[in-house]
Amino acid sequence: MNQNLHTLSDETVAIVLTKLEPISTFLKDENLFEIVINRPYQVMTEGVEGWKTIETPALSFNELMGIAKVVASYSKQNISEKNPILSATLPGNERIQIVIPPAVEKNTISMTIRKPSSRSFSLEDLANKGLFSVCEQVSFTPLNNYLSHLSELKHIDHDLVRAYAKKDFVFFLNQAVQCQKNILIAGKTGSGKTTLSKALIAKIPDDERIITIEDTPELVVPQPNYVSMIYSKDGQGLASVGPKELLESALRMRPDRILLQELRDGTAFYYIRNVNSGHPGSITTVHASTALAAFEQMTLLVKESEGGGDLERDDIRGLLISMIDIIIQCKRIEGKFKVTEIYYDPFKQRNIFGGN
């Protein structure tokens, strides 16, 4: 890197860290998940013991506006009355969402900081911590038909069906990744979707070339042959490229897998394009309340996108059912990440028993 650019980058980071000094204790606390500011002079944190409120005299409205401006500058974006919403990543890799007036009440500022896990857990680690202790199988086809109709499936699915039927979810998911099944991880914000996606990505063989597409750098890819591509959310940033442009570029980059980190807005349509382009093995996330509701949420997202607006809802849903192999529903229960449901229905996917 050019020495002047390196120095400029270091100076910008130093300015950001100085501005964040009033909340630095919370940023360093490994027991916290979220740090939120709803109004001046007050910080709320969420950890294993739930929410706590801390009065913070240093965080005046002007001081918070100063933080917003510095974070915008650091992330090569802009925040103003015309552009009152900012999504960025802090120097410590924390994700921050900032909303200023007039998008929030006058004299208030909203800041939501998502802290990344201080370490990456393997799938086995998560299972030993009780990740699957309350997990249920979810499907359209009755579960008691799975083993009795095994011969109607491709051989590659036989081990998966057996593991799924006996709730051996670690083996099931490990095999699913190895077999390049398309996996969708669903849940609300803070439910452990990213933690689980990191564990699954770690199971991808080292000889595969991986391209990730995100709006905020968050995924950890341990494989040596990978490229992390970043798009500008809402057209902000130095380069006004979106997921569509990055996907088109990724398809020319000799990928074995293309991983779109989170599906929302138009990215759901590009997810379909990605899978249909002959690049299975996707591992991605979406906000949904249940595993089956993820199909409806995805249908809605595709329908609302520019590319999917002319498609019929039933056609979109049918396409999603045929493409998505596995849906994992995540939830935080009493401060612990849990998988509450796993959808896997190769019979419905292949329309073996017919029906809608």
Curated annotation (Swiss-Prot):
Induction: During the interaction with the intracellular environment of host cells. GO terms for molecular function: ATP binding; ATP hydrolysis activity. InterPro entries: AAA+_ATPase, P-loop_NTPase, T2SS/T4SS_dom, T4SS_GSP_E_ATPase, VirB11. ATP binds at residues 187-194. Disulfide bonds: none annotated. Keywords: ATP-binding, Cell inner membrane, Cell membrane, Membrane, Nucleotide-binding, Transport, Virulence. One of its GO terms (cellular component) is plasma membrane. The keyword Cell inner membrane applies. It is found in: Cell inner membrane. PANTHER family: TWITCHING MOTILITY PROTEIN PILT (PTHR30486), TYPE IV PILUS RETRACTATION ATPASE PILT (PTHR30486:SF6). Interacts with VirB9. This is Type IV secretion system protein VirB11. It comes from Bartonella henselae (strain ATCC 49882 / DSM 28221 / CCUG 30454 / Houston 1). The lineage of its organism: Bacteria, Pseudomonadati, Pseudomonadota, Alphaproteobacteria, Hyphomicrobiales.
